[in-house]
Amino acid sequence: MNPRRKSRLKVVVLIMFSVAVAAGLTLYALSQNIDLFYTPSEIVKGKNNDPQLKPAVGQRIRVGGMVVEGSVKRDDKTLKVEFNLNDIGPAITVEYEGILPDLFREGQGIVAQGVLVEPTRLKASEVLAKHDENYMPPELGDKMKQQHNAVGVAEGDLKGESIRDKAELDRTFNTLQGESK
């Protein structure tokens, strides 16, 4: 092989090696910022009720659900707050130190991001509250529909409008129309 070809080959190999190292470092950096989304039921039972698919203790995750009524405990001396979060199944405990969003309250849907410190305990670094009574993050809505359908809850019940509620509204509406004639 002549010297010119050798030098070109060295340059090509060096460039390919540099690109491979850069790609590897980029993928490593991105993997550190990926937070998988779970519902409280999936944390306790695993995704699709498979215990093999539970998040590991120490893993960074995002979890979405509803704040359980009566579960919020605030520390009088610090900004530490502890509350339970559930969907339709079991609840997990979330601990957070910081200022909660204005829309945070019991019975409210939230998404918490943090590290799983015990199998059912999340140390949150960020808590996000939904913006109005109808908003739900798409991923949380999809997961809750899957959980509810598996348990036998009707689609209308997820929206707070069961068939019984709609029938009651129809009767009230018809009664009011009859009185106005």
From Swiss-Prot:
> Pfam families, alphabetically?
CcmE
| Disulfide bridge map | none
Keyword Chloroplast among UniProt keywords: no
Residues passing through the membrane, by range: 9-29
- Keyword check for Transmembrane helix, yes or no: yes
Membrane topology (Periplasmic): 30-181
The domain of life for this entry's organism is Bacteria
Residues recorded as binding heme, renumbered to this chain, are 131, 135
**SUPFAM superfamilies in the record, alphabetically?**
Heme chaperone CcmE
Compartments (UniProt record):
Cell inner membrane
Residues on the membrane's Cytoplasmic side span 1-8
Q: Which GO terms describe its molecular function?
A: heme binding; metal ion binding
Give the GO terms filed under biological process for this record.
cytochrome complex assembly
Membrane topology classification: Single-pass type II membrane protein
Q: What is the first-listed, main subcellular location in coarse terms?
A: membrane
Matching InterPro entries: CcmE (IPR004329), CcmE-like_sf (IPR036127), NA-bd_OB-fold (IPR012340)
Role played: Heme chaperone required for the biogenesis of c-type cytochromes. Transiently binds heme delivered by CcmC and transfers the heme to apo-cytochromes in a process facilitated by CcmF and CcmH.
The similarity annotation says: Belongs to the CcmE/CycJ family.
Name of the protein this chain belongs to: Cytochrome c-type biogenesis protein CcmE
The source organism is: Haemophilus ducreyi (strain 35000HP / ATCC 700724)
